[in-house]
Amino acid sequence: MAVINNQYLEPLRISIYGRSKVGKTTLAAGIPGCHVLNFANVEVEDLQKVTIKAHGGDSFVACEKLADAGKFDMNNYHYIVGWSDYKATVGKIVKSLPKRESSDPRPWIIYDDTTNFRMMARVQYEDEKNKVPGKMQWG
C-alpha cells in the first residue's frame, strides 16, 4: 500500500467524467497538505472509473498546464494533472499547490493534457471513515 504525506493511496477510487479512452496512464496527484505533485500509475477500468494501482517516482511541482487552473477556486479544490508522457513536462516548473490539511475531504480537479479537457473528480475511499462527499460541481 502506497503512503504519501502520511496518507494511504490505496484502496481508493477516483470517479472521472469526460475521459475518452480505457487504458493505463500517469497522473500527477496533488496530495493534501503538500506543495508538490506525486506521480502515481493508474488504470482506467471503464469510462467512469480509474484506480490508483501504485505510486512511484519522485515529487515534482506542477507543469505549465497547471497555471491556468487558477480559474477554479483554489480554496475548494485539489488538482490532479494527467500526462501521457510526463518526461516531456518535467522541468516546466510553474508553481506549487496551495497548502491543504491532510484531512480535507474536498474534491479534486483532473486536467487531461492529452485532450486539453478539464475534469472534476471526487476521491471516494473504500474505508468508510475516510469517505468523502459525493457532490460534484464546477469551480
Segments from the language model and where they lie:
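Conserved P-loop
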Residues: 2-108, 116, 120
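P-loop NTPase motor core
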Residues: 108-139
